[in-house]
Amino acid sequence: MKYKERILSLLAVPTRFAKFYLFLLLFLGLSFLSIYFVYKKIGGNSFAFDKQLISFDFLTYILILLFLYFLFDGLRLYFVLRSINEKVPFKDIFKLVFINIFISNVTPLATGGGFVQIFYLTKNGVPMGKASAATLIRTFLAVIFLFVSAPLIVIFSKSEQFASFLTDNIYTYIIIILALYFLAFYVVVFKKRYICCIVYLFLRLLRKMHFISHRRFCRYKFKSIKQIILFSKSLAWFLKGDIKFVASSIFFTFMFLMSLFSFSAIILWELSYAVGYFDIVGLQVVITFLMYFAPTPGASGVAEGAYSVLFSKFVSQNDITLVTLSWRFFTIYIGVFIGMIVLYRDLFRKGKKR
């Protein structure tokens, strides 16, 4: 009976986050179908595992790169927070790295990642306005790099490697989503009055529908406007912040992206493909850029499809499925698995305290 109760208690803790686990199943299902598509259509029904990918040297390089990848991801948020005069213990930031990877990869358009970061930062004493600003700045630093460099790489590419993948319909879709991204950033950064009006009208609607009392309406209105103003000030604080913290946040954002792009290089070189590092980085920039517009959880389908099509130019049919699967495994699946465990343990610990 004890064991039965123990199992039931373990399963009961995450029910508040049940939708994330449903999204996880969707993510896994789409990932499986995507890899199968690569195997059938790009790989020509051929697959062979290479023992080089379990060699001691390869695993050593990958483990070092994984550590740096997660470390740089944590440091870029840590220094953004320091630049707006907030200090959160790095161990809490490092835990948040994995939770964010899990949530952002199992929710459409990575929408859950930002919210979970704000939630955990506020739990660590960061005001919601500052937590929202830090999350936005962290994302925007990476977005600037990708949204500027990816179009330039496509435009000035000497080969026709992007022509078969980037059709007119995809270009139209990207332009529309890109415009919406920048419109949202513009409103959030420069038009805080619009946000205040939207929040006010929403609270007023709740009041008219008697979901909240007049007292709560006044309190929520005051708190919301206060946090929006704090959010706006935090963006200014970042631009005027301590140069060493601002520079560090930009530097570690760049290092995070370069570590992300380096997984493919190690995989291909281990399989004896003589491909230049910057050729690999160029393709990875475009693929990561496209993943920002994928509506599926974790960009499943889009990521594998774009990767296999672009890298099939110099990877054999026999290896393309293995290379694509290895890339997703090291850059996404491991982080998602660790994040799921970290989130589960965090919820279970809170459940025990109650």
Where are these regions (language model features)?
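Hydrophobic/aromatic residues in alpha-helical transmembrane segments
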Residues: 34, 73-80, 99, 117, ...
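Short, membrane-interfacial amphipathic segments enriched in basic
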Residues: 208-231
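A short amphipathic helical element positioned immediately N-terminal to and/or at the very start
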Residues: 45-51, 121, 227-240
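Alpha-helical transmembrane segments of multi-pass membrane proteins
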Residues: 91-100, 278-289, 319-329
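Membrane-embedded helical hairpins/re-entrant loop segments and their flanking transmembrane helices
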Residues: 74-98, 267-283
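Transmembrane helical segments that form the transport core of multi-pass membrane transport proteins
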Residues: 235-286
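Transmembrane helix-loop-helix hairpins in multi-pass inner-membrane proteins
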Residues: 1-52, 100-213, 296, 300-354
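Membrane-interface helix starts
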Residues: 15-22, 53-61, 236-251
